[in-house]
C-alpha cells in the first residue's frame, strides 16, 4: 500500500497542497498532523507507522514534514528498512 504523510506546524497553514501532491503520487491513505515537528506526539504519524507492512511505501512532500532531526531521520529510516518499507520524498 502507498501511504502519504503531511504535516503543517500551525492551524493557519494549509495541508491541502501537500495532500493534493501526495494523491498525484498515488497515495491510497494519507495521514496528517497539525503540530510542530519537534513534538513527539504526532498522532497521524504514529498511527501510520503502526499500519506499515513489508512492501508498503511512505511518501512525503518534503523530508522536514516527517523527520524532526537528523537523529530522528536515521531512526525512522532504520525502522522502514527493518519493516521492508520504501520511503520517498517528492522534493
Describe the residue ranges of each PLM region:
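Short, structured surface patches at the beginning of a domain
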Residues: 1-91
